[in-house]
Amino acid sequence: YSMSISPSEKIKVAIDGNIATVTIDNPAANTWDRESLPALKAVVEALNADLSVYALVLTGAGEKFFSAGADLNQFASGDADVARVVGEAFGEAFETLADFRGVSIAAINGFAMGGGLEVALACDIRIAEEQAALALPEARVGLLPCAGGTQRLTQLVGEGWAKRMILCGERIGAQQAQTLGLVEEVVPAGEALATATALAAKVGNQSPSSVAACKRLIHSARNIAISDGLVAERDEFVALFSTEDQQEGTNAFLEKREPEWKNR
């Protein structure tokens, strides 16, 4: 069923079981603006608060675009104050998505350009259809990727290919994106959403309390020394023993039954 947790028609949400499907629906190219960005942030915050939601699948409406990035009309005036407001809206939306406690999967059903690729970079896993094209073409229009592009793309593919895409404006196809480690899977046209949803369903086999802790640890590895990460890992392990899910998971296995998670 659809939930009215989105404050904007440009971001649509449907929840089925433990999976939320979030659709960028801003014709014609699913661009980002000052309405859709705060809406995405609000949606992720609402999903974070819903303990029955374990996974989020993000896709674009229609068959051509996942998202073509920022609506450039808002930058035509050259107003730095507008740039600051929009930049902060991008940052808040995509960082909230990156920190979603469950698993986020981008179902890239078409062009993912600029902020459209950056929102996919903020997800945990990316599945692209074979016809999808990915690019960060901001410099071509006198701008730069300010919603994580220079940071997250570099972490995923290394400096060389980040520079080819950002500084040389190279657009890459889905197969090459998989070779580079930018997407985890390539599927036939029209199948990204179904494939992402099937993967999201697998998330529910794991304890949602474990998943949230593991995601925090994996993300923290980007910023801290491994010696600190190894300590944090043990601390998070012990912290799980204050959750109902730890008791349920361990005992369900020993009793040879399926666990019933509580997400607490």
Briefly describe each language-model feature range.
Residues Y1-S8, N251-R264:
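Terminal low-complexity tails and localization/encapsulation signals of metabolic enzymes
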Residues A98-V211, A239-T243, E248-N251, R257:
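Crotonase-fold acyl-CoA enzyme core
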Residues S52, G60-T96, A112, G142, ...:
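Glycine- (often His-adjacent) and acidic-residue-rich active-site loop
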Residues K215-I224:
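Short, charged, surface-exposed hinge/linker loops at domain edges
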Residues Y1-T59, E95:
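Conserved CoA-thioester-binding segment of acyl-CoA-metabolizing enzymes
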Residues S36-L40, V86-A89, A192, E233:
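Hydrophobic alpha-helical membrane-association signature
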